[in-house]
């Protein structure tokens, strides 16, 4: 069998170079990864930037669901009738990532997707950017080791012809925010009949405000890592005062969060964006009522690197609404509704998604695959609700890895 592969490969490379490039430019990235080691000429071709540009322009970029589970990446797929979910290791048993500073396998606890790249945080609190299909990595220097109480998002400067990647670092005060809300008088109870009761006190506008750019000790907490200079710098910009209600996501170089502030004692929601070109923030509209209940769940996802998707679940009705952007730029966004699901009939299996949830949209089957801190996978659609509970939770030397799912479009570089 080995000789047959070698002979076929040799015959292929007897063809003119432009014909070879044309053939391989139509092969999906995931297949190229599997065959690149068959010969040196093919390996060199896949490293050639001219071929990479041609492949990017001509190939249909496949849309995948990736899952971070137990410190490793997996691909997620459904069987043809959509009743079962298959989870397969992305690296097929290979060691996923080697830390060059310790020469041991890197244990990944968090991941952020941008443009086919994964910004990963390891258990040693180091940052590495990984292309899981090409195997390329970029590690930040050890002296730039990240902090446990910081969050990171990856984006790029759209003003450059070639993407100039940057990392935004900001204080992750989620646990402090929870404690502040708890002390402010929030109680969450379930009655004997299974109803959800929410008791709140009146909050003044300053009682549980979180400033995105100010650390608990008062100093500016925003920093930018520029890949072109391989260095960090402090970011001196006007930062919004309020609360991030979702994980961040990246679309076409910009980062986005669901954001909440108080205006005259009333909750005010918006889509907060960070433009890596101008290194500034911008507020955009959200599709649901801006005065939604403050304990509802909001989450963002990216669909095919073309649209943002926003999930909103009311804590009063448990109804889930999922929206997708029709258009989005730096100053304008329009939305269309993708899905509405009432989860109340499925109690007591599910009460409320947390604001640390993640989800993936399957447009063809019109379902959302949701992961939460209970380490279960919830599949919700207009006429269905399923939960997969066969996922176990690992704790590695005190570092946890919550189940996370996101859409992913692979790229060669």
UniProtKB/Swiss-Prot annotation:
Domain F-box residue range list: 9-55
Matching SMART domains: FBOX
Pfam families: F-box (PF00646), FBA_1 (PF07734)
Source domain of life: Eukaryota
Signal peptide coordinates: none
Entry-linked PANTHER family: BNACNNG10540D PROTEIN
Protein name listed in UniProt: Putative F-box protein At3g17560
């Amino acid at each position: 069998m080995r000789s047959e592969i070698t002979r076929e490969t040799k015959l292929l490379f007897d063809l003119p170079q432009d014909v070879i490039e044309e053939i391989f430019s139509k092969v999906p990235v995931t297949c190229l990864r599997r065959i690149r080691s068959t010969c040196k000429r093919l390996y060199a071709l896949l490293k050639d930037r001219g071929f990479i540009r041609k492949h990017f322009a001509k190939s249909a970029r496949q849309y995948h669901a990736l899952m971070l589970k137990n410190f490793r990446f997996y691909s997620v797929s459904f069987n043809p009738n959509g009743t079962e979910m298959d989870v397969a290791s992305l690296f097929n048993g290979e060691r996923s990532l080697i830390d060059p500073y310790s020469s041991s396998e890197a244990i990944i606890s968090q991941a952020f997707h941008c443009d086919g790249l994964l910004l990963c945080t390891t258990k040693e609190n180091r940052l590495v950017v990984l292309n899981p299909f090409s195997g390329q990595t970029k590690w930040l220097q050890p002296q730039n080791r990240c902090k446990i109480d910081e969050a990171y998002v990856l984006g790029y400067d759209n003003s450059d012809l070639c993407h100039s990647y940057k990392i935004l670092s900001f204080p992750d005060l989620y646990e402090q925010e929870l404690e502040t809300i708890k002390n402010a008088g929030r109680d969450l109870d379930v009655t004997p009949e299974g109803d959800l009761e929410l008791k709140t006190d009146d909050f003044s506008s300053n009682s549980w405000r979180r400033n995105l750019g100010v650390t608990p000790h008062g100093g500016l907490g925003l920093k930018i890592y520029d890949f072109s200079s391989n260095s960090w710098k402090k970011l001196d910009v006007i930062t919004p005062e309020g609360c991030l209600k979702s994980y961040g996501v990246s679309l076409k170089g910009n980062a986005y969060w669901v954001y909440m502030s108080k205006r005259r004692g009333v909750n005010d929601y918006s889509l907060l964006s960070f433009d890596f070109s101008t290194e500034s923030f911008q507020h955009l509209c959200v599709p649901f009522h801006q005065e939604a209940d403050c304990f509802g769940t909001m989450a963002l996802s990216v669909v095919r690197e073309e649209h943002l998707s926003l999930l909103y679940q009311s804590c009063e009705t448990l109804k889930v609404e999922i929206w997708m952007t029709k258009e989005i730029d730096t100053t304008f966004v329009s939305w269309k509704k993708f899905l509405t699901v009432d989860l109340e009939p499925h109690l007591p299996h599910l009460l409320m998604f947390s604001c640390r949830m993640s989800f993936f949209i399957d447009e063809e089957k019109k379902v959302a695959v949701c992961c939460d801190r209970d380490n279960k996978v919830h599949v919700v659609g207009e006429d269905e609700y399923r939960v997969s509970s066969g996922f176990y939770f690992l704790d590695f030397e005190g570092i946890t890895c919550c189940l996370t799912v996101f859409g992913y479009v692979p790229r060669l570089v």
